[in-house]
Amino acid sequence: MANIKSAIKRAKLSEERRAHNASIKSDMRSAVKTVEALVTNNDLENAKEAFKTASKKLDKAARKGLIHQNAAARQKSRLAKQVNA
C-alpha cells in the first residue's frame, strides 16, 4: 500500500473507477447476450428492441474508452446481421 497521501488517494480513485468500469462492461456484455439469446429463440421483435439497447451500451462503452471504437462497431455489425437475418 502507498505511504504518500496523494498516492493513497490515487489508489482509492483507481479502485473506484475499476469497479465502475467493470459494472458498465458487465451491463454491455449482458445486453449483447440478451440479443443473441432472443435471436436463437426466433423472437425477432424483442431482439430488435434489445439490439437498440445493446447498441447504445456498446456506443457508450466506446465513448468512455472501455472498449475500442472499432470493437464496438464490429460487435454492432455482427449483432445487426443476426437480427436482420
UniProtKB/Swiss-Prot annotation:
Family according to the record: Belongs to the bacterial ribosomal protein bS20 family.
Protein name as it appears in the record: Small ribosomal subunit protein bS20
Domain of life: Bacteria
PANTHER family named among the record's database cross-references: 30S RIBOSOMAL PROTEIN S20, SMALL RIBOSOMAL SUBUNIT PROTEIN BS20C
Matches recorded under Pfam families: Ribosomal_S20p
Region (Disordered) location: 1-25
UniProt source species: Bacillus cereus (strain ATCC 14579 / DSM 31 / CCUG 7414 / JCM 2152 / NBRC 15305 / NCIMB 9373 / NCTC 2599 / NRRL B-3711)
Keyword list, A-Z: Ribonucleoprotein, Ribosomal protein, RNA-binding, rRNA-binding
HAMAP family from the UniProt entry: Ribosomal_bS20 (MF_00500)
Role: Binds directly to 16S ribosomal RNA.
InterPro entries listed in its UniProt record: Ribosomal_bS20 (IPR002583), Ribosomal_bS20_sf (IPR036510)
GO biological process terms held by the UniProt record: translation
One GO cellular component, as annotated: cytosol
A GO term, aspect molecular function: structural constituent of ribosome
